[in-house]
Design a protein with these regions (language model features):
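An interfacial alpha-helical scaffold signature
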Residues: 1-148
């Protein structure tokens, strides 16, 4: 089970006082956090006794995305989604059952920095805190992390 109270608190603190310190504090916590990324598995996958998916080459994984319709310049841009915990995931899913994988910041970065990447970033808790990380911001975070 994923519980990210420290990250959720940092997101709230940033929303209340959005400055470079609150942003950096939230990013530092994000870098250590595990997130839930909603997926569609086709055909449906079974689970083992520990709740892990049993996948084979026949399974196709599709990551859920959202569009930022408020972005009038780029309304067709899609973003991956991430959730701090199952409560945030359930709020977004409106009671529907949703499969999810565990991911971290680096997993999102790998998907976003592929040469053929379609998504332009990822959104954390779109039904709650709604923190957007465009690909350019992801690149800056990686440079900061790597000391470049």
């Amino acid at each position: 089970m994923i519980i990210n109270e420290e990250l959720k608190t940092a997101i709230k603190m940033m929303a209340q006082d959005n400055n470079s310190k609150s942003q950096n504090d939230m990013i530092d916590i994000l870098m250590k956090s595990k997130l839930l990324i909603p997926v569609k598995i086709s055909p449906a996958a079974k689970r083992d006794d520990q709740g892990n998916y049993i996948l084979s080459p026949k399974h196709k994984i599709t990551f859920a995305t959202v569009k930022n319709y408020q972005d009038t310049k780029n309304p067709d841009w899609s973003y991956f989604i991430g959730f701090t915990d199952s409560e945030e995931l359930k709020a977004w899913a409106n009671g529907k059952k949703v499969d999810a994988f565990m991911a971290d910041f680096n997993d999102y970065a790998v998907m976003l920095l592929k040469p053929d990447a379609v998504c332009k970033g990822f959104v954390l808790n779109p039904a709650g805190g709604n923190v957007c990380f465009p690909t350019d911001v992801v690149k800056q975070i990686i440079k900061r992390r790597d000391g470049k």
